[in-house]
């Protein structure tokens, strides 16, 4: 899977992420880091380059990105969690199964 589009919105203290793959399938994820939405936006911008590479395993991607960045803060974990949710949402939609 390759991510072709990354969108995000800050709603109060929540970051909502929508990732779209090369086939046009999109997935949603959310993360929360108190009221520091701008911090999560900056982190997502940093991770965008990594998300442009093919994704073979959501678990591998999460661990790879978590280890790559030394500032392992709650904000990083919130953004990675939102990305992880969105990727699993895409994978579930591709095989027409619910994501629970």
Residue ranges and their predicted role:
Residues 1-28, 32:
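Structured beta-strand/loop patches that form or line metal/cofactor-binding pockets in enzymes
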Residues 20-98:
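Metal- or metallocofactor-binding catalytic centers and their adjacent structured scaffolds
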């Amino acid at each position: 899977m390759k991510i072709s589009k990354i969108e995000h919105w800050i709603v109060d203290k929540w970051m909502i992420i929508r990732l779209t793959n090369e086939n046009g399938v999109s997935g949603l994820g959310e993360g929360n880091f108190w009221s520091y939405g701008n911090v999560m936006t900056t982190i997502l911008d940093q991770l965008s380059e990594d998300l442009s590479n093919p994704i073979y395993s959501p678990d591998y991607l999460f661990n790879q990105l978590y280890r790559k960045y030394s500032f392992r803060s709650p904000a990083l974990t919130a953004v990675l969690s939102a990305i992880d949710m969105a990727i699993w949402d895409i994978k579930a939609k591709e095989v027409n199964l619910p994501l629970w």
